[in-house]
Amino acid sequence: MKKKTKILIYVITFIVVFLISALIRIMLLGSAPERLIKVEWDESVGEIYSNHDYENDNVNQYDLYIPSGLDKSENQYLILFIHGGSFNSGSKEDGESWCKYYATKGYITASVDYTLQNQGKDASIYLMNEEIENAVKTIKQKTEELGYHIAGMAPCGVSAGGTLAMNLAYNGNSAIPVKFVFQLAAPTYFAPSEWSLLMKVDRLNSEEEFYKMMTGIH
């Protein structure tokens, strides 16, 4: 009995110490990836075109980041950030640090909003894919107006945004050729039985509602 009590005390102590050390790390370091990509930004670094419209029914917009010193006689390349948030939260502002970072590496970058499931707009992944494709068309037009030719792009995103980035990369409908895609923690398997938590978050009451959100088909 005493041995079991000692083991229990050791386990509890380990958990407490682990949680405290993790909390201290977060307080001292913050979000490590964000800190690694944080850059100083001013007019000498580049120009930001904020809150530009693209074709969609729900007033979604995009932000465009143009690094200074790009040669307009040469091909340029775009990195498009698509925010995550379980398809029901997040915004293009989530990609600000990423866009600024990659802009300092010489890439034109952009971050886009899309219709979220909780906005009551009958959103589906099909609609989100369509909106992002429209955003790419508009970004292409805007950069051409500014005198840049984008020869290729890389969509990227986190979680739900990563899924949408892969959809853009592989559905073959991008107005700008996709050279590669990169993402973090993007789901690729959407059987309702594996997504009970997402169904709760998105307040979906049945598998039929889940399929509707995924496909847009009633």
What are these regions (language model features)?
Residues 1-17:
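N-terminal Sec-pathway targeting helices
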Residues 17-218:
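Alpha/beta-hydrolase superfamily serine-hydrolase fold, recognizing
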